Every structure is written in C-alpha cells, then in structure tokens.
Amino acid sequence: MPVIVNLDVMLARRKVRSKELAEAIGITESNLSLLKSGRVKGVRFGTLAAICRYLECEPGDILGYERSDDDLKAAD
C-alpha cells in the first residue's frame, strides 16, 4: 500500500501511550492499533484532526505516501 502510517513514530516522539491517545480522542485501542498498523482502508478527517490536535502535529507527520510503479499503472 502506498500510504504509510507513521503514527507509532509520532507516539514515541511525544512519549504518549496508545491507550492514552485512544481514550483522549474517543476510539478503542483496537481501532487505534489497526490504524497504527495500516490495516484500515481509510480514516475519518475528524479522527485524524483529533489525533493531530492531541499530538500537536500535522497530518503529514502521521501519514506519508510512497509512489510505486503499480500506482502509475492504476492511474492509466
């Protein structure tokens, strides 16, 4: 998948535990774990905004994009 989730990196930088973040933004630890691992098909903007607010970061600090040849073929 070309979208890279760096949430675990940001949590470590901010010294915040997953449980703390999940409680603060109102989602389950299980859902946060799925998001951290990239095993989700999408994330709501509201959830992303809440994460960024709590961790004092930007969406680009959490999400990245890695281009691949397959992406170019799919665009054709």
Task: Go through each PLM region and give its residues.
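A short, Lys/Arg-rich alpha-helix, primarily the initiator
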Residues: 1-16
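Amphipathic, hydrophobic secondary-structure cores in small proteins
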Residues: 31-49
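DNA major-groove recognition helix of helix-turn-helix/homeodomain DNA-binding modules
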Residues: 46-61
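Short alpha-helical DNA-recognition segment
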Residues: 16-34
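Residues within the helices of the helix-turn-helix
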Residues: 8, 19, 49
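Short, charged recognition helix plus adjacent turn
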Residues: 9, 63-76
